[in-house]
Every structure is written in C-alpha cells, then in structure tokens.
Amino acid sequence: LSLIEFMTVEPTDDPELFIGRSEPYGQFGIYGGHYLGQALAAALQTVPEPMLAQSFHGYFLAGGVPGKDLQYRVTSLRDAKRGATRTITAFQGDTQVFFMMAAFKQPEAGDQHQKVGPDVAQARAADNLHAARQLPFMFPIELHDRVEIEWASKTFFEGSPGDPHPLRLWMRVRGGELLDERERQIVMAFLADGPLALNSIIHHGVPMDTHRGASIDQAAWFHR
C-alpha cells in the first residue's frame, strides 16, 4: 500500500467512528505520525469540502499495539460557514491511545509573510553525499519504503551552537505528485513526528546513542 492508502481510515455504520490499520515500526511501537495522519484523515471525512486543516494539537497517551486496528472517534465541537473544530480520540479496544484537537477553515487569500529560509543543498546534491552521511539506524517512517529521506545537514549527531536550523533534510513520499491538497496535509501530519522533531534536541548536541526521546504531544499549523 502507498502511504496515503495506509493512512486512509474506513467509515463505519456510526458516522463518528472510523477504523484504521496499524503496523510495526521496528522497536518503536506505533510511530506517532501514524496517529497524527490517520486522526486527521478521519476528521477530514466529517468536514465539508473545500475546507482544509488549519492546525492540530495531538497528545500521545499510550504506545499502542502494532498490527492491531485503531478506532478513531470524531466529535464535532463547532460547525460554521467558514470553519469547523473537531476532536479525535484513538482507541485500541478499551484503551485510549491518542487524542487530537483540529481546526479547519475555508481556503482564502490573506496577508502573507515568511522568514528567509536557510541555505540547503538541493536534493540531488544531498543524494550524492548519501553514503558519507549514512546513519547507523533507520527512522520509523523509512521502514516500509513509502518515504525517501536525504540528509542535507553537515552532521547529525553534533549540534551547531547558534544555528537555528541544525537539521536539514529532504523528504519525499512515493507517489506524492498525485496527491490532492487534503491528502498532502495527511502526509505532512504523518511526517511531522519524524526526523524534523529532532530539531528540538540536536541544537544542544544531545547524543542519540545515550538518550532516548519520546513524543508527548505534537502541534502543527498549515501555512499556504
């Protein structure tokens, strides 16, 4: 299955309940982005088009059992002409494993601003340096050959004091060029708990061979 096919959740006779697959992610249990992507996919099924996700905040409550189906219950907190708010709770059996609150709105033009991005090696150049930057492990999102990652950072295990962008990389989902805007948001939610989250610790030079990180919560805003 492609990533977007795997993130798809199936409706049930209950309009607020959706069923999603799960699978092992190595020693990490169920990867946090798996919850994020499927929860957003469930909520989007309850929101009329052309609304898109504006933001979400998710809380990881339990590791979950890989290979066991997930049930996502969506609750409507607000439905307005130009926006909507949903909560999404994921269960395995009677165990609550994940919770999300998400906001949605109609696409519209508005004021825009953007910080100047850092200089990053183009994907092809990063690919040429792949062997020199080979990591001694794979990230969960790489395990099922749905996501390609190329590192553009000079180093991975050492922080760069004063550098606000210590981790630079390219990520590509196989078949991503065929996705619509909602599907791209689901994919971005899936990727959000991946390597990019490590920017919070790499800046401090925390050695990954002696420290273990775990996601407690995750917030994201979708900008146009």
Question: Each PLM stretch: what is its role?
Answer:
Residues 1-224:
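Terminal targeting signals and extreme-terminal segments of soluble enzymes
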